[in-house]
Amino acid sequence: MGQKINPLGFRLGATQGHHSLWFAHPKKYSEGLQEDQKIRDCIQNYVQKNMRIFSGVEGIARIEIQKRIDLIQVIIFMGFPKLVIDDGSRKIEELQINVQKEFNSGNRKLNIAITRIGNPYGHPNILAEFIAGQLKNRVSFRKAMKKAIELTEQAGTKGIQVQIAGRIDGKEIARVEWIREGRVPLQTIRAKIDYCCYPVRTIYGILGIKIWIFVDEQ
């Protein structure tokens, strides 16, 4: 059987960049990783509670963290930042206070910025959230996958593969269903492929959604 490598790690330094940009002493490296995870979890929880914007999709494509001696810079790439923009900087300040409460930043200043991304449905995380919302509302998985493919085609991608695994439609035996449209060259390193793995809780149990999007070839 073929061994599946993570498409993002496979392309690091070629077509993909790191989402955390900092250096640390080897002994303190694990602390830095845990700190990053706390920041990401805190932001996602806050967005889930306060910023339900568009059909149950939070719209976070990725969160980049850059650290210096005196500053932690967090950039949130969002597809639908309407609520944040409408409320001005008040929501961002509230989010900064929430994140600072969660972890000890010490003498470092925390700065959070929000960047809007074009073609949000060209990003696998946002697309996975859309499919998860559909599955929670008991929409047929085939219908949800086809709708997701339509949305990515409008975003101008070259290919997409969607896979859903688990107790699909409440069937007793778990299975894997997938659909592909266009080209998805997973073995070509110069092909820019975005990927995400997203768990969704349904009344029948947890389903796993995996999405590969072929953006462009460099």
Swiss-Prot record:
InterPro entries: KH_dom-like_a/b, KH_dom_type_2, KH_sf_prok-type, Ribosomal_S3_C_sf, Ribosomal_uS3_bac-typ, Ribosomal_uS3_C, Ribosomal_uS3_CS. Residues 47-118 form the KH type-2 domain. Gene3D superfamilies: 3.30.300.20, Ribosomal protein S3, C-terminal domain. One of its GO terms (biological process) is translation. Transmembrane segments: none annotated. Keywords: Chloroplast, Plastid, Ribonucleoprotein, Ribosomal protein, RNA-binding, rRNA-binding. Signal peptide: none annotated. The keyword Repeat does not apply. It is found in: Plastid, Chloroplast. One of its GO terms (molecular function) is structural constituent of ribosome. One of its GO terms (cellular component) is ribosome. Belongs to the universal ribosomal protein uS3 family. PANTHER family: 30S/40S RIBOSOMAL PROTEIN S3, SMALL RIBOSOMAL SUBUNIT PROTEIN US3C. Part of the 30S ribosomal subunit. This is Small ribosomal subunit protein uS3c. The gene is rps3.
